[in-house]
From Swiss-Prot:
Belongs to the RRF family. It is found in: Cytoplasm. GO terms for cellular component: cytosol. The gene is frr. Pfam families: RRF (PF01765). Responsible for the release of ribosomes from messenger RNA at the termination of protein biosynthesis. May increase the efficiency of translation by recycling ribosomes from one round of translation to another. This is Ribosome-recycling factor. GO terms for molecular function: ribosomal large subunit binding. The keyword Protein biosynthesis applies. Residues 127-156 are annotated as: Disordered. GO terms for biological process: cytoplasmic translational termination. The keyword Protein biosynthesis applies.
Length: 185
């Protein structure tokens, strides 16, 4: 009976961790990554279109992203979209290909990004704890309605806490990995 409550809690905690992973891909490290451009929208015949749907993105070198537009006339639109996205990147074009050189991050910027990552981790932990609270409330409701015994309630709450601890540890690991990646020169 209480397994459904725990399953629901795991699902909520999974969402918090997945959201954190997705958010962390957008955090700029010293390395080039096409995920930096995920939110860049290009005006394609009057329709805002994701950059990866109007050209091929590649990372030929650790500090370089190249964009090969599928239509040459989109070069200027893509450059404009990158400037508008305010990523701190300056696109250069040779008429066929757009190059984005990722500048090395300053020490101050690295520390700033580390703080951002820690904040993301804390937000994810809040999501995990919220799922725990909902699960504990669900367990208490089951016990109140006499669907489970008091022993089952205690056992369930302990299991929920164990699951919560494992997810918090997973979040801490993700945050420390990303911080290490940011501080790497």
């Amino acid at each position: 009976m209480y397994n459904d409550v725990i399953k629901k809690a795991r699902s909520g905690m999974d969402k918090a961790v997945e959201s954190l992973k997705k958010d962390m891909t957008k955090v700029r490290t010293g390395r080039a990554s096409t995920s930096l451009l995920d939110d860049v929208m290009v005006d394609y015949y009057g329709t805002p279109t994701p950059l990866n749907q109007v050209g091929t993105l590649a990372v030929p070198e650790p500090r370089l992203i190249t964009i090969q537009p599928w239509e040459k006339k989109l070069l200027a639109d893509i450059e404009r979209a990158i400037f508008k996205a305010d990523l701190g990147l300056n696109p250069t074009s040779d008429g066929n290909l757009i190059r984005l050189v990722i500048p090395p991050m300053t020490e101050e910027r690295r520390k700033e990004m580390g703080k951002v990552v820690r904040k993301m981790g804390e937000d994810a932990k809040v999501g995990v704890r919220s799922a725990r609270r909902d699960a504990n409330d669900g367990m208490k409701k089951l016990e109140k309605n006499k669907e489970i015994s008091e022993d089952d309630l205690k056992r369930g709450e302990k299991e929920i806490q164990d699951v919560t601890d494992s997810y918090v540890a997973k979040i801490d690991d993700l945050v420390s990995q990303k911080e290490k990646e940011i501080m790497e020169i």
